[in-house]
A protein has these predicted regions:
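Metal-dependent phosphoester-hydrolase catalytic domains
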Residues: 1, 106-107, 119, 124-127, ...
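N-terminal, active-site-proximal structural segment of metallo-dependent hydrolase catalytic domains
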Residues: 1-75, 80-93, 169-172, 192-196, ...
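A long, amphipathic alpha-helix that forms part
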Residues: 178-206
């Protein structure tokens, strides 16, 4: 049997250890709630049993690293960022855990020429710094993994923070929600462009099986994100793991807003994972969305669970 491994992405939803708060002084888990959140997260790791997993919304890295270590995910990396001093935390990071050695880590740096070409303000900053890592997967190859959490669709500023029209009420009810969300969409699209160019340059310099995974806060078919899968050159194309899977079921939502489901969490794979590519090294057997907690609401559990479904791709080596 050929070697196999799995890759997952998991938005944890405000993983912050008390007495720290997330975004507001009232958002603090008590000891029982925090234990339940850790237990729920641990149980998902046990169920999925990923070999490589990227996380989003990490405020408290040490307890998450300990949960991963207990499940054999002993190799760990956290996106760089300045440590917040206030007890109210507002800057979550992404992280990576693996059963396989992490050879090196780096950040995705915005390309100055692309920033200029897109007419963006300089210096350009990601809303949440992506994490780039090189891992060694025994029996396969080194693999490049980029963990992302792109800008959310929420308005980029609060009502009254940036008045754009003279009518204050109209500004807050209409201008801010519409134009603020548009600003967020532009930021998200710019982040996708920076990722696309960074990976192209990496593949040109050092071609490796590569993965971009995480919470993209949007559908890959949207005009803003479709460029991540763009390019006519097969060697530089990324494809959704679900589209590459040999066993394809229905495309399950990974997030719900009310009764409306969306696929926001994705695993994008380079051509080496495409069984139809001439130089393919691996194939995607199946993609699983772990969404039971979203489909069967439990009001008591909801705050301790995640508002996203983890996504896992099972991969078989073909060499």
């Amino acid at each position: 049997m050929n070697p196999a491994f799995s890759i997952a992405t998991f938005n944890l939803f405000n993983f912050v250890e008390p007495p720290l708060a997330y975004y507001d002084a009232e958002n603090i888990y008590d000891a029982t709630q925090w234990q339940r959140k850790c237990d729920w997260t641990r149980d998902r790791l046990i169920e999925m049993a990923p070999d490589i997993i990227g996380f989003q919304e990490v405020f408290s890295a040490a307890p998450l690293a300990a949960l991963c270590e207990a499940q054999g995910l002993s190799h760990w990396a956290l996106a760089p960022g300045q440590e917040e001093q206030d007890f109210i935390r507002r800057k979550p990071r992404v992280a990576l855990a693996s059963r396989y050695p992490i050879v090196e880590t780096a950040t995705v740096q915005p390309n100055p020429e692309l920033v200029k070409a897109l007419g963006l303000a300089q210096p350009f900053h990601f809303s949440r710094q992506p994490l780039k890592a090189r891992l060694h997967v025994p029996g396969f190859s080194d693999v490049r993994v980029i963990v992302v959490h792109l800008k959310s669709p929420r308005a980029a500023w609060q009502p009254g923070e940036r008045p754009l029209i003279a009518d204050e009420e109209l500004d807050q009810r209409v201008a801010t929600p519409v134009l603020g969300r548009w600003a967020s969409a532009l930021q998200r699209s710019a982040e996708a462009a920076m990722l696309c160019l960074d990976l192209m340059n990496e593949q040109l310099r050092d071609p490796l099986p590569s993965v971009i995974l995480g919470d993209f806060n949007g559908d890959l078919g949207s005009d803003l994100l479709t460029l991540l899968q763009g390019g006519e050159e097969d060697a530089y194309r990324l494809q959704d793991a679900h589209d590459l899977a040999l066993y394809q079921g229905d495309r399950d939502p990974t997030h719900y807003w009310g009764a409306n489901g969306s696929v926001l969490d994705h695993i994008l794979l380079s051509a080496q994972f495409n069984a139809g590519f001439g130089q393919s090294l691996a194939q995607v057997d199946e993609v699983v969305v772990w969404d039971r907690h979203l489909r069967f609401n439990d009001a008591e559990q909801d705050r301790m669970a995640s508002d996203h479904a983890p996504v896992l791709a099972r991969i078989s080596v073909r060499i």
